[in-house]
Amino acid sequence: MSKDDTILVWFLLHEAWLKNALEFWGFLLDVLGKETSEIKEEVEANAAEVNNAAVLNKEAAEPEAAEIDEAMQPNEETAQIGENQVTTTILATKRAAWARLKAHHKEMEGIHMRDLFAEDPKRFEHFHAQACGLTMDYSKHRIRSGTVDLLTGLARESDLDGWIGRMMSGERINNTEDRAALHAALRYGAPGAFPAGEADVMPGVRDVLGRIRRFADEVQSGTWRGYTGHPIETIVNIGIGGSDLGPVMATRALGAYQHERLTGHFVSNLDATQLMEALNGLDPATTLFIIASKTFTTQETLTNANSARKWFVERAGEDAVAKHFVAVSTALDRTSAFGISPANVFEFWDWVGGRYSLWSAIGLSIATLIGTDNFEELLAGGHDMDEHFRTAPYDKNLPVLMGLLDLWYRDFFGAQSHVVLPYDYALRSFPDYLQQLEMESNGKRVTRDGEAVDYPTGSIIWGGPGNNGQHAFYQLMHQGKTLIPSDFIVPMRCQYSTGEHDDAMLSNALAQTEALMKGKNEKEVRQALIESGMTGKELEAALPHRVLPGNQPSTTLVYEHLTPRILGSLIALYEHKVFTGSVIWGLDAFDQWGVELGKQMAKVIMPELRSPREITDHDSSTNGLINLIRKGRGIS
């Protein structure tokens, strides 16, 4: 586009803005869309950079011609980071599709979902999708079919297909650490090589999986015996972050599949209370510890591991350590120094991020407790969702739809949090697991190439068992002033199914989705109060307290029965939902530099807590707290 053309566009846009002519706005956007398509075709024909256009700067009320000209620059380029080439994108707000969505949001923000259901009696039929044993109802969202078209258009303009291909082919898309994100390879059950670009990772993956199978089978069969010759009865997994959250969630979710002789405990917190509660009443002769730390230097894990080792040695002796401690790590020198035989160390790779690691040897505790056949079914479910994510069209693609809806509310409606509500008690730890997955992945303020974003990214994830939540935080969802999109996760049958329990649980889940959508308006409340016998001032006083505005969006995920395979698909569904958002926001979803600063500061503060001198090296608040604790502990 020439500069004269750009100036002409600016004058037309300025005129349209003053007249508030929405029809002309849409026409102008269509014109720009056609021009940018022509530019893209020309550039592709010349084997140059791909060129997508944007028509508006997100914050500009009256954009200057120069700003429009800038938005028309090529939106994809290749940055050199070390030896790794990473494709980066422009800010999402500079995309033409974003501008269209912004205009569309103005049309949608005042519409109640009651009206959307009234205008389309077959709305469920039009807004649900199925894959991998999951049915996703997204009809209770503040969208029309045109909204989905615009959102999927944004995904295409952001090159989501290309990024899916880069991830699945082993490109080092974690550009800040120059690493691949190949967790999909861990659940690739087909024969032959995983379709990764640089090397076939499957021989190593299959070798570790085989070792996991042999170990878990020995423990479950009673072949693995402790220092007294008794079989193992208790597994204590010591880790933190992804080395804890994933195994905790999966073993609780699949408790119905757990070996009848085995019990599992998980320790992650630096507060010794958690470790002591886990060890209380345990017999060292029948207890096996799994120490999960890639570097074997993680402070929380090593502190707990050393305390557990001390507890064990005091009761069983030093020579018994080798039969009761195994590790998931790559640091053979450190695990050997700890007393763990190299034969009992299970490795994983730097292309396995912590929050994606339950599929790897970090899942050793899962496989040991539920059995390797069930663990491999978990992997197969993840692979099922990988294939769906990779091949399904966007309007039928569960992870893509969930990621786009999340972005729709986060960036256009201003929603800050997202609540996850499993009506399957087995999934009680799933919201905790998703907190790390979503907030650590997309809680970023700069794009892959370090440019500050000018839009919100990531959501605050929270939640808990839905039936319990009804008696706790649902009040805020129904009558508060905050928009809170929600996910209802609903089984047709629970793991320990009884007709009465299941019907009560299902009726509550479905009623809540309807109540959040419809609410109860003033007319309906007034009629109900009159029918109850209330009149006059009493009625008028009660009326505003009984109104529920509704219009709270929700997705409902339904499955027949929670199995290892369904759980695998559900986990991978959310992984790919998160990745979809990261692509459109332009983020590196696989690093987590924000967690490092606090760790570094803790190393400074730890010796200061025992220092004989008054601490003055920090800000007044931190100094005051350190000195308060020193004095309270008798150090002066």
Protein language model regions, located:
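Glycine-rich phosphate-binding loops that contact phosphosugars or nucleotide phosphates
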Residues: 214-222, 228-392, 604
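Active-site phosphate/pyrophosphate-binding segments
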Residues: 311-498, 519, 548-550, 599-606, ...
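Substrate-recognition/cap regions that form aromatic- and gly/pro-loop-enriched pockets
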Residues: 478, 490-568, 572, 578
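Hydrophobic alpha-helical scaffolding
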Residues: 91, 137, 141, 198, ...
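Extended, charge-enriched "interface" segments that sit outside catalytic cores
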Residues: 90-97, 104, 109-117, 121-228, ...
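C-terminal accessory domains/tails appended to large, multi-domain proteins
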Residues: 549-552, 556-585, 590, 597, ...
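Amphipathic, low-complexity, repeat-rich surface-exposed segments
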Residues: 1-83
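Short helix/loop capping segments that flank catalytic or ligand/cofactor-binding pockets
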Residues: 125-126, 245-248, 275-276, 299-301, ...
